[in-house]
A protein has these predicted regions:
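One-carbon transfer enzymes
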Residues: 1-274
Length: 274
């Protein structure tokens, strides 16, 4: 069965384009039996340079593109910015309803949130089965990738991870579908840990910020695994090894799963890619 995918991205950075390109390449070379039925971006053309480049990539691939600026929608509604940990303001619910209306002509089996910076309201999360890419292992730090990395450094963690979970109205708390973990200790990275420890985490963060070598290396290792995890996860759906029933991931027998550990497959792919 060819899996039909809806793709959602804010495209604030270049990673969104890399994720989509990786999926399209896997489709083209036959590794993934899927099609991207539609791409949605919550930035309008001309609003952001990175989003513009992403949208041009979508158009060049011949994929239907739908855009609706969440920023301009909020301004037109006179609404306040949604705050972490607080209920979504009414304008956000109205925005999601408009997104659902715009996407109604485009049916898809599963949605992928790849760098989509908005939390869906209950109605949208109930309407679609949505996979969210989160740059931490199950049970790991919540929040944006920057927050995750700083928390890993503060913890002095040995391992990091990437997971894909079902999106819910609660930030990064949906049922885990797949994940992988990887070492952030041992070998050359240990020297970067020693440098960060010598500075002190807070001092290093204040002085170097995201240019801290340890921060950059942890981020590099995570990004290397994001595209393979997205592709391998979509393969589990295309092969019907995993499905979503009643907002829970289940295996081919219908049993609820706690998340497939794809670490072995992802490490093999990373090693083969050099």
């Amino acid at each position: 069965m060819t899996l039909s995918v809806g793709w959602f991205a804010t495209a604030r950075g270049q990673t969104s384009g890399k994720l989509l390109a990786g999926a399209l390449t896997a489709i083209e070379d036959g590794r993934l039996d899927a099609e991207v039925a539609v791409v949605f971006c919550n930035r309008d053309p001309g609003e952001d340079a990175n989003a513009d480049a992403f949208q041009e990539q979508v158009r060049a691939a011949g994929i239907p593109l739908v855009t609706l600026s969440s920023r301009e929608f909020r301004r037109a509604a006179g609404g306040e910015v949604a705050r972490k940990g607080e209920p979504l303001p009414e304008w956000r619910r109205e925005y999601d309803r408009e997104v659902m209306r715009l996407l109604a002509p485009h049916e898809f089996d599963i949605g992928v949130l790849a760098g989509y910076m908005l939390i869906f309201c209950e109605e949208a999360a109930a309407k679609w089965d949505l996979l969210n890419l989160h740059p931490a292992a199950p049970g790991g730090p919540a929040g944006m990738w920057q927050d995750v990395i700083w928390e890993l450094i503060a913890q002095g963690a040995d391992r990091a991870g990437v997971m894909i979970h079902l999106a819910t109205p609660e930030l990064d708390e949906g049922p885990v579908v797949t994940y992988c973990t990887y070492q952030i200790r041992g070998g050359e990275i240990d020297e970067l840990w020693r440098d960060a420890d010598a500075r002190g985490v807070e001092a290093a963060r204040a002085e170097k910020g995201e240019e801290l070598p340890l921060f950059r290396e942890i981020r590099r290792r995570g990004v290397l695994r994001e595209v393979p995890l997205v592709i391998e996860t979509l393969r589990t759906f295309a092969d019907e090894r995993v499905q979503v029933r009643d907002k829970q991931p289940v295996d081919a027998s219908g049993a609820v799963i706690e998340g497939y550990d794809l670490s072995e497959e992802i490490e093999r792919i990373v090693a083969e890619s050099g």
